[in-house]
Amino acid sequence: MGIFGGRKQQRHALVLKDHVIRYVSSKRADLKTIQTYGEVYLPPGLIHRGKLVDKEAVKRLLELQQPEWELKKNSPVQICVPDSQLLIRRHEVAATVPDEELKGQLYIDTGDSLVLPFEDPLFDYQKLREDEEKKELLLYISKESVMNEYVTLLDQLDLQANAADLTSACAYRLFHEQNLLDGHPFTVSVQFDVSLVNITILASGRPLFSRTWPLAYDEERWVIHEGQLEWRLDSESLREEIRTVVTEIEKVISFYQYSVLKGEVEISNMLISGDMIAMDLIVQECTDYFSQMKITSQLDFTDSYVPARYYDALGLMLRKEVR
């Protein structure tokens, strides 16, 4: 996805989530030239469902981290679209609409043939196919007001956003870089993070369908201790949470496989990444539940000394196209 559109070797990948901000810098878009990485966990409420609730507090935290991360003024920065603020839709327009006018046509269609749950869409798209009558597009839609808040935050820090990507595309890119993918056309990516689970169906790395499952991020369940997150409840509560999510993953896979693919193609590959604690338990639960699927996880990563919980920042850093 390219909400912004290519250039420059240096990479400064910055991922903001409800519970954490992570950063990876590299001389260029590969794992062998990583220079710096770091993270800072956020108290509950500063960012909620991807929206910047306390902008000043987030700004202050980033200002404190900039010297340690060696994130200098005027650096070009890559960011991710918040998962909970993203829609993926298929949409058709008339074949007579010129390619250079497609984005404008999407705004014309909004509220008519393209019904959205918010009024300020920001569109990116890929053309899937076209014939004499129509062009079929795959739309990636975020809220312009939300993305503008992130761009404004970077401006206040004297940083410049030069690319925005989907976390699911970033995760897939990292698995590809690690040579952990096979040739199966359809894959389900499960990103099991502390505050959100993102379940995405991809075809050859292209996100086609996505559902998010919010997880409670509050002081009853989590505490920041010596710069790290710690789970406050018992292990059985954690296991129950994992099992609940696994059943939701199964619902998403079944819906797409039988309602969209009409049962004609099997989704047999699953990629698991995330920053939730007990990733080994998550992988085991998925392996047991989806016994007919090939499960590949971040536990298989080998080519980076950066912790695997940085998976989306690493995948964002690997993005080739920046402005």
Label for each model-derived stretch:
Residues M1-R323:
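Hydrophobic/aromatic-enriched cytosolic interaction surfaces used to assemble or bind macromolecules
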